[in-house]
């Protein structure tokens, strides 16, 4: 029996208050309006950015359905939708691609102006929500809200992918893998034979290492205070691993000493101000590039001596690995299907969706790289 055009009642993980567990609730998901798509979720990853929203490090209006790294199947479409149809396998895009704004038309940038990241409204483009719980509207999260059996997204925020793709793996292309991999190959533009340092060895950090390796880096130094993460870092391409706690001097001085004055490319994949500076200082003062990948705490500032850049360093950042989402996600899935990279090393835990709080406990304890929730 078709559900198209009807309200769907389903389970979703609702965050009612900051720093509280998710509550599995029955929610009502309204049909998609014009240029919107309703998706039946199949798998969603738990990303550190979701936890940043739980703690308030990323500001979000409450109550909210979080989740942004996922894959599913189109259940129904609103009027005027042309890029997907019911039954298509898709990945929602937290960085949309409208194709019309100044940024979408820019050859190098991808941060579409129609995003809900900077000052989130928690609504779809028409300013309203498709979620209701206990008679109250529930906010969307960066246009995706994948911690729900069904979600509604704007057409500019969804990409059709290969019908044969395993959704419980390629969901990582919706955020973590692409963010890390693209930071190396597209944002930093790592060169063959170069030296790299990667701060933070979670799922995104490991994806940065995979990107550095794919780009031909000859030396990849992995940095983390959790040495349990070192074997996996080496498995995906790190040539050496160092723990800042093993040294009396600052880690940037250690890296400068072992890399002839600094690496060619450094990446901060944690989201801490002290490591952002350490990563910047770890790249060579005259020719190094440092990329901010991790999401830093909202409304915190940094004091940096401009002389650090005057000598020739480059300091940059990007959302979603610099990839134009609607164009790039299908290609990344095709590359995965062609075995150009593996996502298996990133997936450490698979849990049923109802165990979402357990999945977040694994993330916070450092015991998982990526936990996938299946519906």
Curated annotation (Swiss-Prot):
Cite the binding residues for Zn(2+) 2.
98, 101, 104, 112
Q: Which domain of life is it from?
A: Eukaryota
**Which sites bind Zn(2+) 1?**
47, 68, 175
Q: Does the keyword Metal-binding apply?
A: yes
Subcellular locations according to the entry: Cytoplasm
Gene Ontology CC: cytosol
Record bears the keyword Zinc: yes
| Enzyme Commission number(s) | 1.1.1.1
Q: N-acetylserine-modified residues are where? A: 2
Per its Swiss-Prot or TrEMBL entry, what cofactor is needed?
Answer: Zn(2+)
- Record keywords, A-Z: Acetylation, Cytoplasm, Metal-binding, NAD, Oxidoreductase, Zinc
Please tell me where NAD(+) binds in this chain. Answer: 200-205, 224, 229, 293-295, 370
> Catalyses which reaction?
a primary alcohol + NAD(+) = an aldehyde + NADH + H(+); a secondary alcohol + NAD(+) = a ketone + NADH + H(+)
Q: How does it assemble?
A: Homodimer.
Q: What is this protein called?
A: Alcohol dehydrogenase 1
Specify the species.
Oryctolagus cuniculus (Rabbit)
């Amino acid at each position: 029996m078709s559900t198209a055009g009807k309200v769907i009642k389903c389970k979703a993980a609702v965050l009612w208050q900051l720093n509280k567990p998710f509550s599995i609730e029955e929610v009502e998901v309204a049909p998609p309006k014009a240029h919107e798509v309703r998706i039946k979720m199949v798998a969603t990853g738990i990303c550190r950015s979701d936890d940043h929203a739980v703690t308030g490090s990323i500001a979000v209006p409450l109550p909210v359905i979080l989740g942004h790294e996922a894959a599913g199947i189109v259940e129904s479409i609103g009027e005027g939708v042309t890029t997907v149809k019911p039954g298509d396998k898709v990945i929602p895009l937290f960085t949309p691609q409208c194709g019309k704004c100044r940024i979408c038309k820019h050859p190098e940038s991808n941060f579409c102006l129609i995003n809900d990241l900077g000052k989130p409204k928690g609504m779809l483009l028409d300013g309203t929500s498709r979620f209701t719980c206990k008679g109250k509207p529930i906010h969307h999260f960066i246009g995706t809200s994948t911690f729900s059996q069904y979600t509604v997204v704007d057409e500019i925020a969804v990409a059709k992918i290969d019908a044969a793709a395993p959704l419980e793996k390629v969901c990582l292309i919706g955020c973590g893998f692409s963010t890390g991999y693209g930071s190396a190959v597209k944002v930093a533009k790592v060169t063959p034979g170069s030296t790299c340092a990667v701060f933070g060895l979670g799922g995104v950090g490991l994806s940065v290492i995979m990107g550095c390796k794919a780009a031909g880096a000859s030396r990849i130094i992995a940095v983390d205070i959790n040495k349990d993460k070192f074997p996996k870092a080496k498995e995906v391409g790190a040539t050496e691993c160092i723990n800042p706690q093993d040294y009396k001097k600052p880690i940037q001085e250690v890296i400068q000493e072992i890399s002839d004055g600094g690496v060619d490319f450094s990446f901060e994949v944690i989201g801490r101000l002290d490591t952002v500076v350490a990563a910047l200082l770890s790249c060579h003062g005259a020719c190094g590039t440092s990329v901010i990948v991790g999401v830093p705490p909202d409304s915190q500032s940094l004091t940096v001596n401009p002389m650090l850049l005057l000598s020739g360093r480059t300091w940059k950042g990007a959302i979603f690995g610099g990839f134009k989402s609607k164009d790039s996600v299908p290609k990344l899935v095709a590359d995965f299907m062609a075995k150009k990279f593996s996502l298996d090393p990133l997936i450490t835990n698979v849990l049923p969706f109802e165990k979402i709080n357990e999945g977040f406990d694994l993330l916070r304890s450092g015991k998982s790289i990526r936990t996938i929730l299946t519906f």
